[in-house]
């Protein structure tokens, strides 16, 4: 199946590492202009250079802390001036945060909500009118499998991601008549920078490869997924091949979830 995104412009938050970078690479290779956004300038520059070397569409990068509403506004002022309307928005920024409920402070709740929910709300609002006018738009929200089936000690992530799933349904309902298609990808255990951070925090004496292999062996498919596999799904959802798919929350977890 050939996917052609020539002439489209995609904005990907958390685009310098892991899933975000893999999605940026896939969309760029399909012809899309790609804007990557991240907080860490060093990682952002490295990602930009790597994407430039293999690009099909144009590559842009902006440092932005999407937890900050003012920085988001400044980001969009630059994008509007330098590039123009965004056709594809991938809300990918986020990091795993989970601990016993009674140990989560108000500040930790606010930080998680700002990063994982409010950033998606603000960015979606900023791209919405241009998508309506063009009668074409794609918004993809990267969530977590706990959005559907939260367990003990999965907050605050499970709570904010569940809210992100509700946001996906609201936006898909409002966008359908304007051909703005909004879907969510619920991510399970994927080989990524977050898994690397979990490995480093574990104090394991095993190699990273052994850690990943051992953790993946307990999953239904016997392995973790890859960032490239996630990127393939995002690429499909961003394309005209997914022209009748909206309002879906798709598990990307190798069969881990008990809730479809």
Task: State what each model feature region is.
Residues 124, 160-161, 168:
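Active-site helix of classical SDR
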Residues 176, 181, 245-247:
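Short, small/polar-rich loop/turn modules that mediate ligand/substrate recognition or access, typified
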Residues 104, 150-158, 170, 198:
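Active-site loop-to-helix junction immediately N-terminal to the catalytic Tyr of the SDR YXXXK motif
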Residues 129, 173-174, 243:
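Alpha-helical segment proximal to the catalytic Tyr-Lys
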Residues 9, 16-18:
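Conserved glycine-rich cofactor-binding loop
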Residues 4, 149, 235, 246-260:
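Short C-terminal tail/terminal secondary-structure segment
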Residues 100-101, 108-113, 211, 215:
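Substrate-binding pocket helix/loop in short-chain dehydrogenase/reductase
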């Amino acid at each position: 199946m050939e996917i052609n995104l020539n002439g489209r412009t995609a904005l990907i938050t958390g685009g310098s590492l892991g899933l975000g970078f893999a999605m940026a690479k896939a969309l760029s290779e399909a012809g899309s202009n790609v804007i990557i956004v991240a907080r860490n300038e060093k990682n952002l520059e490295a990602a930009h250079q790597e994407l430039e070397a293999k690009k099909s569409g144009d590559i842009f990068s902006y440092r932005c802390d999407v937890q900050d509403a003012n920085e988001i506004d400044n980001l969009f002022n630059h994008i509007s001036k330098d590039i123009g309307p965004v056709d594809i928005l991938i809300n990918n920024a986020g990091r795993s945060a989970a601990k016993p409920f009674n140990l989560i402070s108000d500040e930790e709740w606010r930080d998680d909500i700002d990063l994982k929910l409010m950033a998606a709300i603000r960015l979606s609002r900023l791209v919405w009118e241009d998508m309506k006018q063009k009668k074409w738009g794609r918004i993809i929200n990267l969530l977590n499998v706990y959005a559907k089936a939260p367990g003990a000690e999965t907050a605050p992530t499970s709570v904010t991601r569940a809210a992100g799933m509700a946001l996906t349904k609201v936006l898909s309902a409002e966008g359908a008549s304007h051909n703005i298609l909004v879907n969510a990808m619920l991510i399970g255990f994927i080989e990524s920078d977050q898994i690397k951070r979990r490995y480093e925090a574990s104090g394991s004496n095993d190699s990273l490869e052994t850690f990943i292999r051992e953790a993946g062996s307990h999953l239904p498919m016997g392995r973790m997924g890859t960032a490239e596999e996630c990127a393939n799904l995002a690429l499909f959802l961003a394309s005209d091949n997914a022209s009748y798919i909206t309002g879906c929350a798709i598990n990307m977890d190798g069969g881990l979830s008990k809730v479809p």
